[in-house]
Amino acid sequence: MRLLVTGGAGFIGANFVHSTVHEYPEDSVTVLDSLTYAGRRESLDGVKDAIRLVVGDITDAELVSQLVAESDAVVHFAAESHVDNALDDPEPFLHTNVIGTFTILEAVRRHGVRLHHISTDEVYGDLELNDPKRFTEWTPYNPSSPYSATKAGGDMLVRAWVRSYGVRATISNCSNNYGPYQHVEKFIPRQITNVLTGRRPKLYGSGANVRDWIHVDDHNSAVRRILEKGRIGQTYLISAEGERDNLTVLRTLLQMMGREPDDFDHVTDRVGHDLRYAIDPSLLYSELYWAPKHTDFEEGLRDTIDWYRANESWWRPVKDAAEARYQQLGR
């Protein structure tokens, strides 16, 4: 299969490229990435001789059309994704997550190419902490941040292009990912690298907010399954059913790194911070017979800590800038 992977130098996209190269060596992989601060050429060093990297913007219609015409399928990871950045400056999120997705859709429509669109559970808003409900494919959209609103907009465009133009597309909405190559602005790698650089870890508010954690490799194996077996026009929710509150995750991480479990600072909470995300992945499990392999969160977290310990040359160049940005925001 000739795959075009947008955002393939970012966290989830780079891991998808690595797994594709190793598990599907017959595939040819082209990565389209603008290499903004969160997309890094170094994330593809281990597979650079097995892929083609094209540096460009997904809103460049001519470039996108050319690359899509050479492909059998597009896996669309490219997105601006950090909520704090969206609250401070939403324009890049509209540019990439909405206009970029429109550009991809027009290209796959023109050339008749299969598309899988990667999205987030944040489009559904949040749940109360003690609410037994979980998100399903039929939960109404209720985004609560500029980031999730732009991702919801992209999802709606995909659905409209499927119905109006017969585009062969699927959508997946996934819960919070963790694993290698995640930018140090994100919750888990920020805390790991704070410890490794002698900084105190930081926790928004009380830390009661709940996230549904999944290892990035499990997310990507589900994406591959949907790409190959998913029903056109269908949305699938991806989850390893790993709900944990942020305080518990931080304390677990600190203990694994030899620190006292309360050796961190509480900082000002994010405006409108979503309380709880929880996904019901029953459709994916029952229809496509997918299941996660990394079901032991503590083991996955320990492996992630080990990866950051062993790959300081990857994260160290961006760490100081990320923390300076957090200082500006008072977090």
Across the structure, where does each feature detected by a protein language model lie?
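N-terminal Rossmann-like NAD(P)+-binding domain of SDR-like oxidoreductases, especially those catalyzing
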Residues: 1-177, 307-311, 317, 321-329
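Residues in well-ordered alpha-helical elements
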Residues: 62-65, 84, 91, 102, ...
